Amino acid sequence: MTSTILASSQQTRFHIANSTMSSLSGTSSSSKDLDIPDVSISISNSDASDKKKGSKGSVAENEKEILADAHLKLSSGVHYALVGRNGVGKSTLLRAIGEKLIPGIPLDIRIVSMQQSYDNPEIKSAKDQMSQGEDVSVLDFVISSDQERTEALRRQKDLQVALDNTQDPTAAVRILRQFKFDDEMRVLDEAKKAANLRSGARGMAARKELKIIETRVEEKRVGLEIIDTQTLAEETNEAMMMLSDIEGFLEQMSPSAVESRAKLILRGLGFKLKSPPTVTQSLSSLSGGWRMRALLASVLFQPSDILLLDEPTNFLDLPSLLWLETYLQNDLPANTIVLFVSHDRAFTDSVAEEVLVLRDLKLERFPGNLTAYEETRSERQRYLTKMAEAQSKQRAHIQDTIAGNVRQAKSSGDDKKLRQAASRQKKLDDRMGYEVGSRGGKFKLNRDLPGYHLTSRAGIEGMIPKDEAGVKMMLPREPGEELRFPGPLISVEGLRFVYRQRGAGTVTVKEALSGVDLVVHPKSKLGIVGLNGAGKSTLVRCLVNQFSEGGGKIVSGSVKYHPAARIGFFSQDAIEKLPLDKTALQLMMASLGDDPGSASSQHEARSVLASVGLTSFTVSSVPIAKLSGGQKVRLALAQVLYPPPKLGPVPHVLVLDEVTTHLDADTVVVLAEELRKFKGAVVIVSHDRWFVRKVVELDGGEDGSAEGDEGDEDDVGAEPGVVYEVEKGRLVELKGGIADFEKKIRSRKAG
């Protein structure tokens, strides 16, 4: 069963933007803004791939709605952060925009996207080349990602070879006709897409245009090999002119300048240009994380009108992340639209100029970054709540006054007063509501509430921003078993760890860790930061005593464990190890003992999953393959907290390696609060500066949480933890915490 994205908009039934026709005619639309009303998007799990979205507002049972009559507006040159809970469809929306599935997106607009997946089309293309024996280097992969330039180079080569072919004078003509045929096929594909998106009179006109193009394509197909000697010289001259135009286009981008720009981007993302260079390594030799960096480099390298980035910071260390911040802020063309999703709050606040909030099937737009949005929303919520309460008291007072007047009128038989009371009641019902105009001044009905309404004022209660249901996550407060005697949980002393790399008859020893000392006490909160490749993951593997085959060994020093200590380990590849064909409930029930299928076992498994926010239909009917990245992280975290064979007991120490990857901002906030309340030890390896500050340093910075959070009570008397940096195989305590590390990185980049 495959998933299909179904998209519609107002453009479907009424009109397609003029830019769509301009792309078919070969011209380019001047504006690159997107302003599309009534956008509806859903995901269908039906096998019928040619199924179209039904009538407005109708959704089939096998469809999941992402947007319903939402307004999609992206302005030229603005950087947008797309935020929303895990599973609401942020990645689906980016894909729908990137693949131009939404009617009204101009076909000639250049959209470049990075998806949150190893199965990205660009990576797949590179893999196809590898399977055919055409392995590509990282640098070549990035340079060749500019498809317009790559196609121009291919045509230049083919035309030059054909024109130099003295044995076959018709070679250049055949190549010219093939190029024209390829261009017509692209126009045909666009015409089919435009015809499918239209209806009514415009749809009929589009289908007539499609018939004309199909006829033209068929004529060119037939004429590919039929060469008229009378037009041979004319078409050969046309081929020479095409070659001249292509060479003029390529002269504007010299090979040296192109390579320099590609190297600049790769270097910023952590690739080495020398000693030894990693930009010349084959793409197939890279790990998954470094392949995603190469993909990000290729996306940044390509010219674009709209740049879509889905979790671009997931595989970046702090230097690369800071470089990406600067690049997006300062080095993109001024009119480029950027729409990105990121769980890193510091990165989001730094890059975003506006926020798009995907909530309740709508897109809410806010001018400012994420922190400003949360502050403004909270302030408006408090302001309108107070206004509603005050007006409620005023309404009650007026209602009492009217009731008193009615009683007096009835007792005295004064019909005039009775009519007066009825008039006041009518005014109360019609005009009591929001009294502030759209410009902040006095309310004016025609300007501020146009159209037909049941009353002359909007109700205040309906204007108060509604809070989403809180992120559901309640981790255990303490380890499952009390230690019978005191002592450190993990003690590392003088640790030296090496890798042995075998070459052609030689063995190279690479030192990963040297002289490392570390003690994890029962209530320690420790943060470990450092550059990629510095040895963080190696240190973590030593702490949890998990090594891959041929993954090196400890040659001196020691790692000692409390004999009764239980260690829970969340690895970077935890979600990749999940069985995709099972449901979350099936996975957790398989961890139970003698009778995993019993009702009591199912209840226990559901309780465990509910503690990390996975409930109902999601755990029982949705295969793990269909879960969002954040939901998979929650499931993997549940396995760490409640290990088999009996779903427990809870470990004494949690070692979490990049656990915030794929989590939305709200979930990261709640996870940080829950880890602060955990009475066991926590060791965090993370590039998320905010997360380390919150959990380890007990920082109470901006997080969007409500005032007076109950988690503050758990911090009373608690001492901040310690942040360490792994640098060139050594472990160094950072006295100033994560701020010291960030300061060091920025000064190093400036130098």
Question: What is each residue range found by the language model?
Answer:
Residues R382-K426, E435, R439-G451, E742-G751:
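ABC ATPase nucleotide-binding domains
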Residues M1-K386, G470-G751:
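ABC ATP-binding cassette signature C-motif
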Residues S423-D430, G451-R457, K536:
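Eukaryote-specific, cytoplasm-facing alpha-helical/coiled-coil scaffolding segments in long proteins
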Residues V138-S145, L153-D158, N165-D168, S411, ...:
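Internal hydrophobic scaffold segments of catalytic domains
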Residues A7-S9, R424-K427, M432, I460-G462:
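Interdomain "pre-motor" coupling segment immediately N-terminal to P-loop NTPase/helicase cores
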Residues S438-E478:
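Amphipathic heptad-repeat alpha-helical coiled-coil/stalk segments that mediate oligomerization
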